[in-house]
Amino acid sequence: MKDRRRRETVSWNRFFWCTLLLVLSCVLFTASTFREKFQPEIVSAWRQPAMEATTTIMSTNSPAKPSISIRETVMLPDQVLIFVNYPQSSRLFTKEDFSCVYFSRNSTSLSETQLKKPPNQIDGTDVNNQIVRCPLNPRGFSVSLELKSGGGYINPGPTHRWDSLVYEAMIDRDNTTVVFVKGFNLRADRIYNASKFECVYGWDFRKTKFVLRSNVISIAQEIVRCQTPLSILNNQLKVNNAIKVSIRLKGKGTLHSIARPGVQLLTDPEPGLRGEKPHEMCICTMLRNQGRFLKEWVMYHSQIGVERWFIYDNNSEDDIDSVIESLIDAKFNISRHVWPWVKAQEAGFAHCALRARGLCEWVGFIDVDEFFHLPTGLNLQDAVKNQSNSGNNVAELRVSCHSFGPSGLKHVPAQGVTVGYTCRMMLPERHKSIVKPEALNSTLINVVHHFHLRDGFRYVNADKGILVINHYKYQVWEVFKEKFYRRVATYVVDWQNEQNVGSKDRAPGLGTRAVEPPDWSSRFCEVSDTGLRDRILQNFLDPLTDLLPWQI
């Protein structure tokens, strides 16, 4: 009897454990099946820093979506910049692929979206740095993106204000980090005490145990030069998509940052047999919605000796992309750099100077409505050599600007600004500069019109009989009124504001409203000047078609 009871006990024990094993197997199988079907893809922490919430597409319409994410969002005064990350294998999307979606900040889900708008534009060709520009969100609303193809909403990333932000950074060839920052409101044209600030590197600046700190070498305007920690330099290729850099005023908090130092600037290319750089003469410019004027500006300057153009695009919404592509197809050496930052022209010019330094002997910093004019017919390169031969230490030519008026016109001249506008003010206004980027002061201080130079270098004023700038400043009203939108320079007051109304940057007598005066077409006309017009018609006009190259 005892043996029988023992056998029954063993049988029940075996039954219990077999049943339990079967149930657990079913549970694990079910969980595994549902996890494969519904679990969202985890964005790799290598690509997505720990400080940022994982922001993948959330949709019930399709289980197989690429893990597109919003890295961060920056609120500008008139629009929103949304920085989008893609998987490396994904194609770049276009403006037509996205909708900007707006939802109440009290919403608990993106499904409660209350408003959709098309993006203003989409910029960038890098899967880690594409920018979708959305219309500004209404008060009380947040903004995110929807991928139209599958109805997928993308969770919003961290949001920052544009006026208190570290927005760009690059590691220079001397291994320092050049950082571009808004929020300190430093005065123009002045170097500040670097010991009051420090540089901060890390994934999450809120976790002070996991950040690196380094000394500020110099700080002026919106440009900070930092001593880069060795651990950042030694692991640069591994961490440059994750590590951020920021600046802290000692005793205060660390500024928000979206700036990743990125790949170190390339060292200068191998020089030629005589030590020349690839290009003798280059131009940097910053523009917004100037696509229709760009062909004339590039083609003309190419003929007088400019070899390379750096275009900094400040949130254009015209067809600037296609214009630049057509110029590239025509063998012009031109590149577009997206520079979305508001009132940051000085910083943009400094950024451009660093990029051009290894490629260009001389760089001119002018606008698209400004044209170098050589009254004697010299080539620009020859004129620069002529004007800078007073010593090896000349590193900047300051070129006087003549301001042209509407010249009696009421519509945009069909043959271009150089032919259409022929009447100007008698005396020059201000100047613009051609500089040797190698000779710039390490602070990169500039006031748009000229730079600070290193010790031992000097500037000269160009002879107005040899080299001047025709500035087509006061064009027909439909073009000129765009200047009221916003001035791009950091230290220049927007024209709608009452401050500094008497500035030379403004048009005399216009006030703060974009209202066309009845006599606008006849203003700013003191001297007839057809010098550049005559040269254009003589050297550029096709005798068979009577067309200029930029009209084709």
From Swiss-Prot:
GO terms for biological process: glycosylation. It is a single-pass membrane protein. Residues 277-520 form the GT92 domain. Its EC number is 2.4.1.-. Keywords: Glycosyltransferase, Membrane, Signal-anchor, Transferase, Transmembrane, Transmembrane helix. One of its GO terms (cellular component) is cytoplasm. The keyword Chloroplast does not apply. It is found in: Membrane. InterPro entries: Glyco_transf_92 (IPR008166). It holds the Pfam family Glyco_transf_92. It is an enzyme of class 2 (transferase). The keyword Transmembrane helix applies. One of its GO terms (molecular function) is glycosyltransferase activity. The chain crosses the membrane at residues 12-34. Belongs to the glycosyltransferase 92 family. This is Glycosyltransferase family 92 protein RCOM_0530710.
